[in-house]
């Protein structure tokens, strides 16, 4: 069966389950796997207990740990469920998961409606134009209110929901849904425990008499929305003709794929009610790989040259690695979304991001709780591959003869760091393993050894990012460690030019001495992602022997590592070696290296040194009533407001704010806006620190 499904991409859905942390994402995903498992194994006597055991174990470990993408089958269609990260602060990771999905199911808590975190995830999906259907979950919960939740989708998200189901009963009496497309009732009358075996079957009945008026009212709204998509449907509708189920579904699909509306369904995943119709809606309304625009990438040699790849097996092979995970038996698994072409196990491909050859080892499709080996990969699908040695998250794999880069991987430099000290020798070894594994998975995570203290310093994109990395070290790798306070990664530079600075290094202590004489010029230069320092040699007539010139450069580079104001690395400096002198016996590479380092330090003191700090590009989305407070708070943090605009029911404020002022911002924003505003933050640029603030930092560093 699997092979039949694979070839017809119209029958494939690559989806994510998006939700607030408590809206029931795990339970919903589990139930999807459970029901699709039953359907996939028709004719097999099912041992309910064994499946539930497996689900409980999954729940304990968290479903996202076992697999970043799970394949299941529903009514002869294939659904690949891609894990969407729970933390929206990691834009790189969120971007990547949203990039490999074609559609999503947004799960809402039927009592709480749209919560702040669901708002954040929703806005992120808006940004990438991901078509969605909404599942109002927990309809059996005390206080659950379907109509309230739909209102919050309109008011808090500014979205256009299209109600295609209504609940029958509520709280403890919730027993089914009214299907407004086919105008029928679906009921699950299992025992009080919501028996799963009974949950797998439901009855199709007449709409209850007491809900007929409500159903007619919402059906009329549905038909009106649907009829507006097409002139012939509009004519039919106003002519009093009945629209067919096929016509209604086709129109809802068209509107959903274009993100014009979001179909809303309801149920209780925990009580096994409403999950199967939701799966039907995934197939009926969410896009297949053929419904989304073809993939764009650029030429390996020319970033300006755009290349298009269609989801077709006749096109050259291209795929994006979107997750690297460690499997208990197979070791390193790389999850890939194949965008074009096909390739067999054992083939050689090229990692065009890094320019390295890779060999595809075993290929799996992850079927809920087991790996299903396949011989080859096909466009439009998600696979897990073994054997890729150099490929990390975000790399492109492609045909060596027809190369493409799908994602330009210029990751922002880390702006925040924290020292981490293992408690024991054993922890030190485990820390090494943890760092290596985490760096493979997360390209924005860096690490270095502090030469002076011997501590390991980990660097990341923000406070929350570091918290989660440290938490993962403890949880997944059992590293017990003391963690320091987060530190901002300041830099130093110069604003003035020193045209000539002479320095002589001379040491005579019996035997051969040390001698090096140099004259250098230093001046500011523009910092780019590729270049923060430049060295130029203008010595003529061999006054400094050629073999010693690289030593002067190396000495200056050493001095750049520890700035003269507060010991931070220096950037944006051009140094030119103008002149010098050497001694036949006493000169050496080491003597010229010391001279380079000392000359630079002395010259830099005269070149108007200044401190630089990372400025963050901050975007806050807030309901209008809190806008004044949010702007006032950003101003008090030395922020500069760049723009204010409207976006689907909220105000969007963009500002540049120094990172040092953003510690603890998440809590302050939550309290100022009752948890309704959300923000994202990414590195913008380095800027000069105001003198009063700089003096304080310099004093603090000298005091320590």
Curated annotation (Swiss-Prot):
Please state the protein's primary subcellular location.
Answer: cytoplasm
Gene Ontology terms, cellular component aspect? cytoplasm
Its BP terms in the Gene Ontology are: ribosome disassembly
Residues bound to GTP: 19-26, 83-87, 137-140
Instruction: Please tell me whether the keyword Oxidoreductase is annotated for this protein.
Output: no
Pfam name, any one: GTP_EFTU
Source organism, top-level taxon: Bacteria
Which controlled-vocabulary keywords does the entry list?
A: Cytoplasm, Elongation factor, GTP-binding, Nucleotide-binding, Protein biosynthesis
Subcellular location per UniProt equals:
Cytoplasm
Q: Which Gene3D superfamilies match?
A: 3.30.230.10, 3.30.70.240, Elongation Factor G (Translational Gtpase), domain 3, P-loop containing nucleotide triphosphate hydrolases, Translation factors
Start and end residues of each tr-type G domain: 10-290
The record describes the protein's role as:
Catalyzes the GTP-dependent ribosomal translocation step during translation elongation. During this step, the ribosome changes from the pre-translocational (PRE) to the post-translocational (POST) state as the newly formed A-site-bound peptidyl-tRNA and P-site-bound deacylated tRNA move to the P and E sites, respectively. Catalyzes the coordinated movement of the two tRNA molecules, the mRNA and conformational changes in the ribosome.
Instruction: Return the protein name.
Output: Elongation factor G
Q: Please name the gene that encodes this protein.
A: fusA
């Amino acid at each position: 069966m699997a092979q039949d499904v694979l070839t017809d991409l119209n029958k494939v859905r690559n989806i994510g389950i998006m939700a607030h942390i408590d809206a029931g994402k795990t339970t919903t995903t589990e139930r999807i796997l459970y029901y699709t498992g039953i359907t996939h194994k028709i004719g097999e006597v099912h041992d309910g207990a064994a499946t539930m055991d497996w689900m409980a174990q999954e729940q304990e470990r968290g479903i996202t740990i076992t697999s970043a993408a799970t394949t299941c089958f529903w009514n002869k269609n294939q659904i690949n469920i891609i894990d969407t990260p729970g933390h929206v602060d990691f834009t790189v990771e969120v971007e990547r998961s949203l990039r490999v999905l074609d559609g999503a199911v947004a799960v809402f808590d039927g009592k709480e409606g749209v919560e702040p975190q669901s708002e954040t995830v929703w806005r992120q999906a808006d940004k990438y134009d991901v078509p969605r259907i909404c599942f109002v979950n927990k309809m059996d919960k005390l206080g659950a209110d379907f109509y309230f939740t739909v209102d919050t989708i309109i008011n808090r998200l500014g979205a256009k929901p299209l109600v295609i189901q209504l609940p029958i009963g509520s709280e403890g009496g919730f027993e089914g849904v009214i299907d407004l497309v086919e105008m029928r009732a679906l009921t699950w009358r299992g025992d009080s425990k919501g028996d799963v075996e009974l949950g797998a079957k439901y009855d199709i009945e007449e709409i209850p008499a007491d809900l007929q008026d409500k159903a007619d009212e919402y059906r009329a709204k549905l038909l009106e929305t649907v009829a507006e998509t097409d002139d012939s449907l509009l004519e039919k509708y106003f002519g009093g003709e009945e629209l067919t189920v096929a016509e209604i579904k086709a129109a809802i699909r068209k509107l959903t794929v274009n993100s014009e509306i979001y179909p809303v369904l309801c149920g209780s995943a925990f009580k096994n009610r409403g999950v199967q119709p939701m799966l039907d809606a995934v197939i009926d309304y969410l896009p297949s790989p053929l419904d989304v625009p073809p993939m764009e990438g650029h030429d390996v040699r020319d970033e300006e040259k755009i290349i298009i790849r269609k989801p077709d097996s006749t096109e050259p092979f291209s795929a994006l690695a979107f997750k690297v995970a460690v499997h208990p038996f197979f070791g390193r698994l790389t999850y890939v979304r194949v965008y074009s072409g096909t390739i067999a196990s054992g083939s050689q491909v090229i990692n065009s991001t890094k320019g390295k050859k890779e060999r595809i080892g075993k290929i799996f499709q992850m079927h809920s709780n087991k790996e299903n080996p396949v011989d080859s990969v096909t466009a439009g699908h998600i696979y897990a591959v073994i054997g890729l040695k150099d490929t990390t998250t975000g790399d492109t794999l492609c045909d060596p003869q027809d190369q493409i880069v799908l994602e330009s991987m210029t990751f922002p430099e880390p702006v925040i760091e924290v020292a981490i000290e293992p408690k024991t020798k054993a922890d030190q070894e485990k820390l090494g393993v943890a760092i290596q594994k985490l760096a493979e998975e997360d390209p924005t995570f860096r690490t270095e050894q502090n030469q002076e203290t011997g501590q390991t310093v980990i660097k990341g994109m923000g406070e929350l990012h570091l918290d989660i990395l440290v938490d993962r070290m403890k949880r997944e790798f059992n590293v017990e460690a003391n963690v320091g306070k987060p530190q901002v990664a300041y830099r130093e530079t110069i604003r003035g030019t020193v045209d000539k600075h002479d320095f002589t290094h001379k040491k005579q202590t019996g035997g051969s001495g040390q001698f090096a004489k140099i004259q250098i010029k230093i001046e500011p230069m523009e910092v780019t992602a590729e270049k923060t320092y430049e060295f130029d040699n203008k010595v003529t007539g061999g006054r400094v022997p050629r073999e010693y010139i690289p030593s002067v450069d190396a000495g200056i580079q050493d001095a750049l590592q520890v700035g003269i104001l507060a010991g931070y690395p220096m950037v944006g400096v051009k140094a030119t070696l103008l002149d010098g002198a050497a001694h036949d016996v006493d000169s050496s590479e080491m003597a010229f290296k010391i001279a380079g380092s000392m000359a630079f330090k002395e010259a830099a003191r005269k070149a108007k040194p200044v401190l630089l700090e990372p400025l963050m590009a901050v975007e806050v989305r807030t309901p209008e009533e809190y806008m004044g407070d949010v702007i006032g708070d950003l101003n008090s943090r030395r922020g500069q407001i760049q723009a204010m605009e409207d976006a689907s029911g909220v105000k969007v404020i963009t500002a540049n704010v120094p990172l040092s002022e953003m510690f603890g911002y998440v809590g302050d924003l939550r309290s100022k806006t009752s948890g309704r505003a959300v923000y994202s933050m990414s590195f913008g640029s380095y800027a000069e620190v105001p003198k009063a603030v700089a003096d304080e930092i310099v004093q603090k560093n000298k005091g320590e």
